[in-house]
Each structure stands twice: as structure tokens, then as C-alpha cells.
Amino acid sequence: MTQVAKKILVTCALPYANGSIHLGHMLEHIQADVWVRYQRMRGHEVNFICADDAHGTPIMLKAQQLGITPEQMIGEMSQEHQTDFAGFNISYDNYHSTHSEENRQLSELIYSRLKENGFIKNRTISQLYDPEKGMFLPDRFVKGTCPKCKSPDQYGDNCEVCGATYSPTELIEPKSVVSGATPVMRDSEHFFFDLPSFSEMLQAWTRSGALQEQVANKMQEWFESGLQQWDISRDAPYFGFEIPNAPGKYFYVWLDAPIGYMGSFKNLCDKRGDSVSFDEYWKKDSTAELYHFIGKDIVYFHSLFWPAMLEGSNFRKPTNLFVHGYVTVNGAKMSKSRGTFIKASTWLNHFDADSLRYYYTAKLSSRIDDIDLNLEDFVQRVNADIVNKVVNLASRNAGFINKRFDGVLASELADPQLYKTFTDAAEVIGEAWESREFGKAVREIMALADLANRYVDEQAPWVVAKQEGRDADLQAICSMGINLFRVLMTYLKPVLPKLTERAEAFLNTELTWDGIQQPLLGHKVNPFKALYNRIDMKQVEALVEASKEEVKATTAPVTGPLADDPIQETITFDDFAKVDLRVALIENAEFVEGSDKLLRLTLDLGGEKRNVFSGIRSAYPDPQALIGRHTIMVANLAPRKMRFGISEGMVMAAGPGGKDIFLLSPDAGAKPGHQVK
């Protein structure tokens, strides 16, 4: 039965733009995509969006380490993420970035509305500061012992063990993640969102019955503990959006990250030339539905701060949050050393996307339970279910239809009651997809697959094919098998997009939810081609080994000059400005009697002569070759008395030593006495 079409906006949590997509990420994106594909099959108007979370200190620091700009890094990472999601056939309508003009404008709009409505408070706070790096430390760059449950090695904003949130100043024995130094306290003026003002609204939203029971129970614990004002600002240096009329202050990444949902949708509307839909979906009284698929680690932000921000800025709240658990591999946390910390791209080098989509789907429910990817069970389940039960149903019937009946199916069903059993299951299976009871849906479908294969086994078309005068029976039996295959693939279409494409090509028809009510009668199918290949443990072993090799490549010791001679501690610009570097002409160069390391250089600074002893003899056995060259010297270095005389400066050279010392020279045109700036 056709449903009334709904307008639905679906989002996944925004992947952080400083690392690759891995199988933990993929659980959420697959779960959301299966649900979205089902909604589309039922005729609903679905907009499915995501974006990269592209702001924050981690982005800034990693870009510095790579020697590139944050903009360049997040641009490259966005392309990588989108390639991975496309490889898994995640059907996004738009994939954007929080570092966008749409997101800037919306962040400033929401902030200004909150401020106008009295929900932004200013106050001076004491904040952790890294004395070695000269920067305030964001929450995730401080680690210590959780003040609530006393678990060690927890971040400065929330505990991954007990789920508590707190200020980084509350950590026990905090350490800077950047330098390892013990942070010191410094004062800074910050901006706070007045979350407690929304306590009554949030409690009513929690009691509405829409949220998962586990989420509602956790929120009740937070209400009982009392809501706190939320610090939404960070001090420079910071990669993000500067707060209007507050120089040197930036929006905290968790303020503009969820606004990224709105920014990505706004970008999609603009691409379509659709100026109406944005307001239609986000206005206060919107009748469109809004769903966020998220992991259990970010429930606090999405269940408290996000709806409160929307309420306070006169936008609509989410219809619901769909929260999932973590992914373990072979019963344990994903491990780089064991090769079970597997990137999405690595998986696709060894297996197809449909295999993981099916395995995750078969294990998912509407509860917030962790999902274990047992790699041996994965191989057995994919082969048993997809290959043996579903694909084999088509292959064992298609041969007879193609060879004996030119691909034409029978004009009547051999067993109408069995077919009705299959189509009647649409209600139960559809409800399971709708309610995210994916494991139940798969169990129902596989039970039908068992019925279909039992029918074929009992009818034994391979026996009938050898009996004279039974061509009509053979055609009817095999046509029945192919029609049952069609129903099964229709139910599995949200899960297996690539297998569905191949099945539709064979069946010579599109698979639609309502279409299965009418069987394919007198219909011509195409020649059968292999739809899916079996997988084996050798592929798993290769996958694990490849993951280990990737870890070795990314964690291998640094080689080259920096490994043996690392960069010194950071100095300030004022420190650097004290060094006066000048261009000098080498007027004379000679050996120093009694030294096997030094050369005596006479340097012209453009009106002033200097005598400098330099330890470069091993690289320049013929001092005369240096005469007439220009070099760089430290002109304001205090004279140093040596047993050979007084050295009045230092020339600049590079290299590890010995014969590999290279005197630095300025570009052509530089004159003696010119200052190096």
C-alpha cells in the first residue's frame, strides 16, 4: 500500500577532517544509507546530507606538521572522504564542509539570535595554557584522570568511560597533549551559551517518547546532575570562524559543527536554485522530518546543546536522534597492531562494499549496542546468505529458462499461495526497515529465502527437465523460483545496491516495493550472468596484512635530516629579530695553522671588515676557491676569543658535517652589508 509522501532530511555525524574513514565510521553511514534507501523506495522525498567537520586546533596543528595550510589539508581530506563513501555506495545528495561561507553565515546568525535573546553570557575564566607552546589548550589537547569516575588518560571535555562532561580544569593531573608539559592557569574572557535556561524544554522533549530509551535515560541523569553553561569560544591561534566583534576569539568547533548540517543543506538548496526548501525544512513550525544518525559518544552534544541552540535561535528541533554503538573487530577494540584497524579504502581493495553493508545490516537494531565484525563469521555469513540462499536461487532456475524457453517466464504462477506468503511479508519487513530493526528484517528475508529454496528442492526442476512432456511444468517451476528471487532482492534493495543493479539487469525490470504485488508473467529475462562471487579467508588474511603494512608505513621512524637533528624549541618573533643576518663578501680565506678544522675568513660587510674563524675546512680543502663568494653571516654575535685570535661573527652553513658542509650564499644581486629579512 502506497504511503503518504513525507519530506525527510537525514544526516550522519560529520567526519573530522584530519584522518581517514575507517570501518567504525562506516557502520553509521551504512545504517543511515539503508534507512534512506528504504524511505526512497516507499516514495518519500528524502534529502541525505553530510559534510566534513573541518575546524579546530587538531586541524591547525596537523596542517602545521604537514607543512601545508589547513585549507589545503581539509580540501584533500574531503576528496578522500567522498571517494570512500562513494565506494560504499552511500547515496548522499550533498557532501559539504563546515569551512564554508554557508556555515559561517548560519553560525553568525544563530549566535546573533542567541545573543539578542539573552542566551550568551560573557565572563573571565581561568584556562589551561601550554607554557612551552605558548597557546591555550583546547579540551581535546589536555588529558588526565576523569574527575567523576577516576579513569586515567581521558580528554579534557568528556570521559569516554563514564560519559561525563566537565571542564578541562577539573581533570586530575592534566598534561598537554601537544608538548607533554603540565599546563598552567591563565585568565581569558570567554562566551557562554546559557544551557540551563532550556532545561524545562529539553526535559519535555526527552519525555516525548521519540528518543531511544537508553538516550532518554542518560539525559535524565544529566538533568539530575544539573545543566551547566557551555563555553562556545576559543582563543587564537585557532582554525575556525572568528566571533563577530570579538577579535582573537573563535567559535568552538562544537558550535559550528552541527550547524554544518544546515550549511550542507543550504548549499544543496543553492545548487538546485531552490530558495524555498531551506526554510521549509528548518523553520520553527516545519512539518518536515529531521533525523540525525550519530554514535553514542556524541549524544551529549546532540541531545542537549544542539536542540537548545536551535530553540534559542528560532529554528526547528530534530524529530529524533538515531544512536548506534561502536564497532569491535573479532571481539576486541579495533587494533592497528593486529591489523583490525581497517580503513574504508583498504577494505574496498579486498572486498566489495555490499558484503560489509550486508553484515553490518544483519547485526544492527534500534538499540545502542556495539557491533562486532567477526571476520570468520563475516565470510561464512556472506557466503551462506547472499551466495547460497539468494543468488543461487536465481542461478539454479535461470539456466533452464534461458536455454529451454528463450528467457520467457510462464504466464501463470505455479504456487500463488507461496507467492502471497512472500508479498504479505512486505508489511513486517517494511516495518523492520522503518524502525531500524535491521537484523529482524534480514532474518525475515532469509527465512523466506529458505522457503524459496525448499520449494525448488521439492520441485526438482533438474529432474523434471529430463522428463518428456513436462516442459510447461519446468517453465512454471523455474519461473516461480525467479519470481521469488525478485521479491527477495526487492526487500534487500536498500542493503545491496550493486547486487540489485545486476539483479535488475538480469530480471529486465526495476525492483520497486509496490511492484512485487504483480508477479512477472510472460516476461522475458536476460541471459544470466554471475551475480556475486564467493569470498574466503585468504581475502581476510590479505586485508589484515595490508592494514598492518599501512600502519608500519604511517608509524615508521622518520628518516632524513630531521630525524638526526630535530628542530629546536619554538622561539618568539622578538627572539628571532635580535639576530642580525648580513650579506658578506669573502675577501680572503686561508688555513689556520695548528687546526685541522678551521678556516680563517676575512669578510667585507660593505664598509666594515670582519675576521671570522669557521669550522668548514673538511668541506673546503682549497680555501682559495671561496674568495670572491658572497655568504651570510651573523653580524651581531659577540666576539669570541680563541687561541688563534678573535672571531667577530659566524658564517651560515648547512649539512651533517665532514665533507657535507655547504656554505650558504644569497641570490644574485645581493650586496655586502644587505640585511637578511
Swiss-Prot record:
Report whether Ribonucleoprotein shows up as a keyword of the record: no
* Gene3D superfamilies, per the entry: HUPs (3.40.50.620), Isoleucyl-tRNA Synthetase, Domain 1 (1.10.730.10), Methionyl-tRNA synthetase, Zn-domain (2.20.28.20), Nucleic acid-binding proteins (2.40.50.140)
Instruction: Please provide one cellular component term from the Gene Ontology annotations of this protein.
Output: cytosol
BP-aspect Gene Ontology terms: methionyl-tRNA aminoacylation
Q: Residues that bind Zn(2+), according to the entry?
A: 146, 149, 159, 162
Q: Which cofactor does it need?
A: Zn(2+)
Q: What class of enzyme is it?
A: ligase
Identify the residues that the record assigns to the tRNA-binding domain, covering every copy.
575-677
* A Pfam entry, by short name: Anticodon_3
Cofactor binding mode, per the note? Binds 1 zinc ion per subunit.
Return the similarity comment. Answer: Belongs to the class-I aminoacyl-tRNA synthetase family. MetG type 1 subfamily.
What function does the entry list? Is required not only for elongation of protein synthesis but also for the initiation of all mRNA translation through initiator tRNA(fMet) aminoacylation.
User: Could you tell me what this protein is called?
Assistant: Methionine--tRNA ligase
Organism (species): Escherichia fergusonii (strain ATCC 35469 / DSM 13698 / CCUG 18766 / IAM 14443 / JCM 21226 / LMG 7866 / NBRC 102419 / NCTC 12128 / CDC 0568-73)
Q: Which gene encodes it?
A: metG
